[in-house]
Every structure is written in structure tokens, then in C-alpha cells.
Regions:
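Membrane-water interface of alpha-helical transmembrane segments
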Residues: 28, 96, 100, 178-181, ...
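Transmembrane helix-loop-helix hairpins at the membrane interface
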Residues: 143-310
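N-terminal, membrane-interfacial amphipathic/helix-forming hydrophobic leader that caps
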Residues: 1-92, 245-310
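Juxtamembrane helix-loop-helix connectors linking adjacent transmembrane helices
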Residues: 35-36, 43-68, 73-159, 164-174, ...
Length: 310
């Protein structure tokens, strides 16, 4: 019971201060800085002493899952305070511009991206960067920690993406031609840069960290465009969790997150990870696809939207 009470307290710990200080900010850059500072405040939850005799409760707390949910709750209140839609998940409204086939294509490319990132196993031979895969899921890594360490970034980092998207949409609302591209590519850039802190994590080299910063931007492009097209934050959360969980099941949750050997295939793989998702997002910027992105952007901003429904 006391653990649940502790969790309930932690979930709303920073809410008053966040609303008071960050909620009052009007400048988009200062809002990004404020959100970034709030994100760093949720690290101490790993120091909360929950007995290892309660393995699920211990892992959920120490791996930062509670912190992730706390930021998600905070994001809803901040969005409302800034005058935006308070729920990151928009109610589905099928306009004449929305196409199920486009959503299926986006889901397919996102799944391919997860599969490539999780299972590509190249060596120095050029062809292996395209066609060599290894699925090595190990039973010894099917642990609570592997699950919770993937769940935490799936929730927390996608919440941070949502906040970056709405902040950038609002910051560039006067230029409707550029607000959606800026929100998508800007949030992906911030997502990539957030991995700079991984340098040294369980032996990850600085070169590998730079490669990770660049490589994950590709996934960031897809997850951002998928969110704006579907209006559902839980969809990219699932894909983000799946990518990390598959990695954990192959090498353990506390292994180095990225490898870089300086081979030509390292660079080819990086290019594939970024350019393919980038091409998908560019394709989404035109026609009815773009109109759906704009409609959902307006809805997130609480701006009036005229839907032509079937």
C-alpha cells in the first residue's frame, strides 16, 4: 500500500511548479528548455527504495516507468495550460482526406524500421548492410528489467516528442506552410540529440553515440509523422517500446545501446536508417496526406477545423 501511495505522490510531484513556471511561458524556445529541465527532474525516482522482494514494483520504480507516466500526466496539464488540446490522443474523425491505405503504409514502414534496427547484422561486406539479419532472442533476457527498461523510453520519450511537436506547431503557427515540417523534423532532431548522454553507457563509445544520434532520427521522423497522421500517441509508443524490447531480448537491457566499427557498412546502415524514413515523411507532405497532418495539427492547437466527412 505504501508503494502505491508513494507512486501517487510522485505522479503529481512537479505538477504545481510546472504549471506555475513552465505553463506561463509564451516563447516556444523557452518552452522547449522548460520541458527539457522538467525531464531531468524525473531521474531521482530511480533512487526511491523499493525492496527487490517486490520485483515488479522495484523494477517499475527503479527503471523510471513511474517517472514516464508522471511526465505524461504533466504533458496533459501543460498542454491545457498553453491552450492546446489536453489529451495527446485525438478522437478519430474520418475526414474526406483521411485514407486507411496511407495509415497502413505508414504502419508497414514503421514496422520495417523496427525490424531493420532490431535485427540487422552486417559485417564488412557491403551486401550485409541490406540483407543480413539475425534474430537472436534469448530466454535469459526475458526479465522484468528488460520489459520495464523498454517501457520507460516508449512512454517518456514519446511524451517528450508530443510536447516538442505542440510547442513547435504553436511557435510557428503564423507560417502554416512550414509549421508541420518544422514540428516533425524538429522533434526528430531533438529526439536524436537526447541520446548524446548515452556516451560511455556500458562501454558505448563516443563514435557509436554520434552514430546513434543520427540513426535514431530516422525512427523519429516516422514516429512523428505517424502520430500527426493518426492522432494517436499510443501508436508510436508501442513501436518505440517494441524496438527497445527486441534489442533487450538479444543483448540485455544494460548493454551498450549502439555499436560502430568504422566500416563502410556502418555508414551505409546509417544512411538507410535515416534516408528511407526521410523519404516517407517528404512523401507525406503532399496531397491529401498533408491535409490530414494539417487538420490534426489544428486540432492539437484547439483551432477550428472544418471536416468534409463521408
Amino acid at each position: 500500500l505504501w508503494v502505491l501511495l508513494l507512486w501517487m505522490s510522485y505522479l503529481v510531484l512537479l505538477l504545481p511548479l510546472a504549471i506555475l513556471f513552465v505553463g506561463s511561458l509564451k516563447n516556444w524556445f523557452l518552452r522547449l528548455v522548460g520541458v527539457g529541465l522538467l525531464g531531468t527532474q524525473y531521474g531521482p525516482d530511480s533512487l526511491l527504495k523499493i525492496s527487490k522482494n517486490l520485483p515488479w514494483l522495484h523494477s517499475i520504480t527503479s527503471q523510471g516507468v513511474i517517472a514516464a507516466f508522471a511526465l505524461l500526466i504533466l504533458a496533459c496539464f501543460l498542454g491545457k495550460e498553453w491552450g492546446f488540446h489536453s489529451n495527446p490522443n485525438l478522437k478519430f474523425i474520418k475526414s474526406s482526406n483521411f485514407q486507411y491505405s496511407i495509415l497502413i503504409i505508414l504502419l508497414l514502414f514503421t514496422f520495417i524500421d523496427v525490424f531493420y534496427n532490431a535485427f540487422i547484422s552486417y559485417d564488412k561486406q557491403i551486401w550485409t548492410a541490406f540483407f543480413r539479419y539475425s534474430i537472436d532472442l534469448q530466454k535469459k533476457y526475458v526479465t522484468i528489467a528488460s520489459f520495464t527498461s523498454a517501457l520507460e523510453p516508449g512512454i517518456l520519450e514519446e511524451t517528450e516528442r508530443y510536447l516538442a511537436i505542440i510547442i513547435l506547431l504553436a511557435g510557428f503557427k503564423r507560417n502554416r506552410s512550414w509549421r508541420v515540417p518544422i514540428a516533425i523534423y524538429g522533434s526528430a532532431l531533438l529526439f536524436g540529440l537526447s541520446h548524446l548522454g548515452n556516451s560511455g553507457w556500458n562501454g558505448e563509445t563516443f563514435e557509436a553515440t554520434i552514430a546513434q544520434v543520427i540513426g535514431v532520427m530516422g525512427s523519429g521522423f516516422l514516429w512523428a509523422i505517424l502520430y500527426l497522421y493518426s492522432g494517436k500517441l499510443w501508436i508510436p509508443m508501442i513501436f518505440h517500446f517494441l524496438m527497445d524490447y527486441l534489442a533487450n531480448l538479444q543483448s540485455g537491457w544494460n548493454s551498450a545501446g549502439w555499436q560502430f566499427n568504422g566500416w563502410a557498412t556502418d555508414y551505409i546502415s546509417e544512411v538507410l536508417m535515416v534516408l528511407v524514413p526521410l523519404a516517407v515523411t517528404v512523401w507525406m507532405m503532399y496531397g491529401k496526406r498533408r491535409k490530414v497532418l494539417e487538420e490534426n495539427a489544428d486540432r492539437l492547437m484547439n483551432l477550428p477545423v472544418e471536416f468534409n466527412r463521408y
